[in-house]
Amino acid sequence: MSTEKKYGLKDLERRLGKQSVGAFLRSWRLSEELSLKDFGKKIGVSVANLCDIEKGRKGVSPEKAEQIAKALRVPPALLVRLSIEESLRAAGLSYSVDVKPVAKRAA
């Protein structure tokens, strides 16, 4: 039996503050030991934009967040949620959102 405490997203946010797309991308890039150039190429973002996103100077639209998530093969809902929550915080609103994919309707 392990006595190690397991942390969920809520626990991490309490300890480290609100998560962001930029913080997520920076952590991912550093864990993969990729340069800004190589990582930017992988996710379809220029070096300048990636730098601005990582430093919190630029946000990411939900659409772009979904594209990035697909390139990284992570659940798109994760980055889309972070993107929407960042937009809300930038507007001075304190909300948490739950994002779930819905089936596309036939045309």
PLM segments and residue spans:
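Residue-level signal for the short linker/turn that defines the boundary of a DNA-recognition helix
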Residues: 20-23, 33-34, 60-63
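Residues within the helices of the helix-turn-helix
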Residues: 26-27, 37, 48, 66
